[in-house]
Amino acid sequence: MKFRFRRQGNDPHREKIKQDLFAFNKTVEHGFPNQPSALAYDPKLQLMAIGTKSGAIKIYGAPGVEMTGLHKDTAAVTQIHFLYGQGRILSLLDDNTIHLWEIVQRENRSHLVEVHSFSLPGFVPYSGCISPNYATRVTVMLLKLSCDLLALGTEGGGVHFLELPTLTLLNKSLFQDEIMQSVPEEYRCGKSLGPVESLQEHPQDSDKILIGYSRGLVVLWDLNSRHVDNLFLGKQQLESLVWERSGNSFVSSHSDGGYMVWAVSSSNPCTHDPISSTVPYGEPKHIAPLVLFSGGMPRASYGDRHCLTILQDSSHVTLDFTSRVIDFFTIHCTDKDKEFDDPSALVVLLEEELVVIDLQMVGWPTVPAPYLAPLHSSAITCSCHISNVPPKLWERVISAGQQQCPLQNYENWPICGGKNLAPDSKQKELLLTGHEDGTVRFWDASGVSLKPLYKLSTANIFQTDCDHNDSLTQAGEEEWPPFRKVGCFDPYSDDPRLAIQKISVCKYSGKLVVAGTAGQVIVLVLSDEKSDHMIDVATVDLLQDREGFTWKGHDRLPPRSGSVVFAPGFQLVVLVQCMPPAAVTAVTLHAEWNLIAFGTSHGFGLFDYHRRSPVCTLHPNDSLAMEGPLSRVKSLKKSLRQSFRRIRKSRVSGKKRAVVNSPTSKVQEHDAEVAPVQRRIEPRSADDSLSGVVRCLCFADTFLRDGTHHGPTVWAGTNSGSVYAYALDVPSQEKFSEQSVEALLGKEIQLMHRAPVVSIAVLDGRGNPPSRLTVHLKK
C-alpha cells in the first residue's frame, strides 16, 4: 500500500513557528581574527586591541578575557589607540571617521560600547562621479599621554586637534604655510612637504610634538607658543619616527631600508645631518642598543619576505614570517624615572597570526599564546568535537603536549589585564581539527579561548619530501641576512595526499582513527612512553576481482621503511590502506569490539585491527538488495566476494529490472537462480557515479532481526539514500585472538527521495543516543 501526499506551499505561519523554534545566535568566536588591520596596547590595564578590515574591534587580556565591538559601517579599521588606564579606545576607519569606544559594566559584565564619533570636515572620498578631496584625509593619529588631546595628521600636510573625550574640533589647526616660513630657502623644493607620516609626543615635555613629513622634513613644534623649536632636514622619504627615552634624540626610518639617529639641541635649531645613518642590510656595524624594525630588506633579493629584525650588540636575528606584518609593539617599563625602557616582550600582529617574542631570554624565543592561535595554520579539512572528556584522558593529552613543547608555559603570557569572571567549566571539552598537512591538532574547547594542547603529525609514517624541504630550510638559515622562521601559519602542504579527511575517537580507551586523502586509515593509541617499531601495514581492496577497472587518480602514500620513533602521545597501531587509494569519506571506531569501518567512493570495509585482518568489504552499487526474509541471510565473509561477480536476473537477460509491487513478485525473484557471470563495466552518468559514495558509518548494539534480541551491528549510509545494516558476530574479550569477527548482511533500506544519508544514530526508548559507556556498564 502506498500513500502520496501533495507538497504544500510555504505557509507563513509555519515559517514563523520555524523561526521561533530554530534560532541561531552567535555566542563566541574562536581562533584568529579574520583580516586584522590595526593593533594597540594599554600598559596600565594590560589589554591588547586588534582591529579588522570588517570594522570589528577585539580586546584581549588574561585568558578568557575577551570583548568585541563592531562599527555600524563596514569599513576597515586603520588605527586604534588606548586612552591609557581609562578603559577607552579610539579607532580610525578608512572612511575617515574617528570613533570613541568605552568599556562599560552591565550586569557585572564588561561590554565594549561606542560613545562618540567624529568626521573631519572637507573630506570627499572617491565616488566615480565626484573628484576626491584627500587633503583632509587622516594619515596618522597622536593621542597625548594626558589623554585630553588628539592630534590628527592629514594627507594635505595639516595637523588638527580634537578635545577628548568629546571629540570636539579645536581652533588650533597647524598648516604647512606656518612650517614653510621656518624652512631654509634651499630646502624648499616645491610647494608641498607631503603628507604627515608620523606624530610623536616629546617624552619629557608634553607641550612639544614631533611632526614628520613624507618628503623627509621633521619638525619639533611647540603647542603653546605655536612656533618651530627645531628643524631636521632629512633627504630620504620618511616612514616613521620614534623618540629615545630621554628626549635628547629620536630615530627616523626611511624608504631606502635605513634609519637615522638625530640629536635634539636647543643651540642648533636647524639640523642638516643626523648623528648616525644605518642601512642594516648593507655592511654590518656594531650596535649596542636594542633596535627593532619591520621591513628594510633589499627589494631585489628579499622583497617578497615578511620580516622583523632584532639588533642588539653582536646579536642579530631576522624573524621571517609567512604572512604580512601589520604592526608590533613592545611591553616595557613605562616609569618615567627609569633610565631605560627595559623591554621584556615583543608582540607582532601578522595578517594570519599573533607572535610574541621573549626579549629577556637568550636567543629571543617565542612565547606560546594561550589564545588567538591560528586554527587555520594549515587548511582545516575536518573536525571532531568531544564533550565530557574523562579526566584521565585529559591529563594524558596535556602531558603529551607538554613533552612536545617543554617551554610551553602560559603563566609567562605578558598580556594579562582584566579578570575572567566566568566559572571554570565542570566538563572538559576537546576539539580535534584535521589539516591539509596531515596533522591533527587538539584544542581545549572548555572556555572562550581555544588553547592548543597537542599536535599529532601523520607525515612521519609515510615517505614524503618533508625531510628534503627541512634540510633546504636549514641551509638557508645560515645565509645572510640571518633569517629565522617564526610562527606556525603555513598555508602550503608538502603533499596534498596527507590531508586528514575524517576523525573518530574513543574517549574511554584512548584510541584514535584518522583517515586521509590517499585512502590511508591510521589506527592510533595513546601511550605515555616513547616507542620504536616498524610500520604495520594492511591493505584492503574494496574492488576485489573487479576486472576492467583502472584507477586514474593519485598513488598511495608509501609507508616509511625501517623502524620509526614515536614520541609520547598517540602512536601507530596499524596503517590500513584502501585500494583504490581514493579519499576516505567516512570512518568510525568501536574500541570494545576492536573494529573500524571506513568508506570511500568505491565502497566500504570492516577491519579487525586486533587480528590485523579485514572482516568484509562491499561496493553499494554492486550489492544484492535484501528482498526476502531475514532467515535467508548469508555470511558476508563466505559469500560477499562472490556477490561482486553476480548480477540481477534482469541484467543477465538484458532487460530493465521491473519495479516490485507485490509479495508474489518478490518470492519469484528470490527463487530465481542467478548464475555467476562476470559483470559488464557499463558507463554511468555523473550522478550515478556518486551514488555509491559512503557518507556515514555507525556501530551500535541494537535490535536488527527483531524487537527482542539485540547485538552488535554496523550501519552504512550512502549518497543515493541507501542504508545498509549488518549484524556482527563479535567474540568475547577472552577469545579475540582465537575467533574472528563475522559480518552478516541484515537489511538494506532505500529512502524514496534518495537524498544523501549524512548521519546515522541509534536512540534509546527516550529518544536519546545512549552513551557507549552507559551501554558497557549495563552489560
Model regions: which residues?
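N-terminal alpha-helical scaffolding segments that mark the starts
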Residues: 1-58, 67-70
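Non-catalytic interaction/regulatory modules that flank or connect domains
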Residues: 273-376, 591, 602-603, 710-713, ...
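Per-blade loop-tip surfaces of WD-repeat and WD-like beta-propellers in eukaryotic adaptors/scaffolds
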Residues: 15-25, 59-68, 100-123, 156-189, ...
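Structural hallmark of WD40 beta-propellers
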Residues: 45-49, 67, 86-90, 99, ...
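Short coil/turn segments within WD40 beta-propeller repeats
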Residues: 54-55, 95-98, 156-157, 215-216, ...
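Canonical WD40 repeat/beta-propeller blade segments in eukaryotic WD-repeat proteins
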Residues: 30-40, 75-82, 119-143, 181-202, ...
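Extended amphipathic alpha-helical scaffold segments
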Residues: 312-316, 320, 330-337, 341, ...
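Sequence/structural signature of beta-propeller modules
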Residues: 1-15, 630-650, 655-665
